[in-house]
Amino acid sequence: DILEHAILNDKFEKLALGSLICGLGFGNSSTTLGHGLSYVFSNEGIMHGHALAYTTTVAHKFNSSVFYERFLNIAKKLKFEKISLKQEIDKASDLILIDRKHLDSNPKSVTKEDIIELINKINHLNLS
């Protein structure tokens, strides 16, 4: 809530504390589909956090997450430029499927067809 409040209300002095708390949360849990999707974008030179704004947004929607709207509002507030995967989606989906660490911890099972659909959604999503 601290990081969300800082971003949505331009309380920049709270960003460091909010980021620290979020980082501690990641360190004590595991990441899921959003991270699994992000690496094929980051491997093409898109900054990891920028890629995550898109991949985590579609992952929240896919998982029917109660946090989807909150995350979407934060990502839109930050006005991330549109991203699009350059490599062939079928090959990218095969790479993502190998990343069992992130897919196995996801609350919903993920198929290759799901990944292809999610990448297509990311390629058409605009958060700016």
List each language-model region with its residue ranges.
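Active-site segments that bind and position negatively charged phosphate/pyrophosphate groups
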Residues: 1-76
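C-terminal charged capping/lid subdomain of soluble metabolic enzymes
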Residues: 68-128
